[in-house]
């Protein structure tokens, strides 16, 4: 993006159902950022456009930003399948994942990276704004993600682990903690959001240490 003096660059995954963008400053825009741009650009915020679906991994800052725009925000389980199901259940049109699965129900029934990219670009053209200008209207909460390889995913039910998570949840004024088994790998995934990155990193490291001690 910087080398070519481009306003934006598009990157799709191998099968084309996920997309990320890079803005004119070289910042990588994930699915949360793209969802915000699409929500921001939509003047109709009633009926099928009254809400947005994210997942449990969506940044808390996105939830706050979407709600400030006047939308409802609901979290589905991780996976574009679950986002699509929640959209159908609510009768809404827009949802997606941090990983870049973006679903625009008015254009496609499932995640399509090319469709999502074109929708974002057309939205920015209509706004006559660059990505960074739109995204300056919301702030992400510092987030740390880790994955620990395990032989038994039931570790997430360990009493010591649950006790520690409950303890630190009471210390975090803004943010979230999510511990979940991977749906595709023998791993436990850790996500910690906190007011600053150092706090998030410390808590994530402590949780990882407890899990590793149980393996």
Segments (PLM) and residue ranges:
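Short, structured secondary-structure boundary patches
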Residues: 1-4, 32, 93-99
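Short, acidic/small-residue loops that bind anionic groups at enzyme active sites
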Residues: 28-48, 77-78
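Short glycine/threonine-rich catalytic loop with a Thr-x-Gly-x-Asp
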Residues: 12-14, 28-35, 108-111
